Amino acid sequence: MKVYALVGKSGTGKSHHSMWVARENNIDYIIDDGLLVSDNQIIAGKSAKREPTKVASVRRAIFSDKIHQDEVKKAITDYNIQSLLIIGTSERMANKIADAIGVSPIEKFIYCLLYTSDAADD
């Protein structure tokens, strides 16, 4: 499996630009905030954005929960995923996610340096 990571600070537009990055790199699946997504459809996982606290949100996004990990691992196997884009705020976070869901090491990091109007608020 080819594993890529899109990394950048909060508010840099990672989620917004992920579809373009995936298309440009022939990537069919994306891990974003605890979800495995393909063609804008949720395949597996639970959204970190629905967690009640920032700590819970981060834990969800990095797949700290074994049941959450196993659900996404199973989907990766069942769908025979050949390429995956992991979205994270840092290389360290992306590597933690890759390790938690049991995928190959990340072979390419793509950096999101674009700032949206929300970035100024962070």
Description of each model-found segment:
Residues 30-79:
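Conserved nucleotide-sensing/catalytic segment adjacent to the nucleotide-binding pocket
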Residues 115-122:
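Conserved small/polar residues in nucleotide/adenosyl-binding loops
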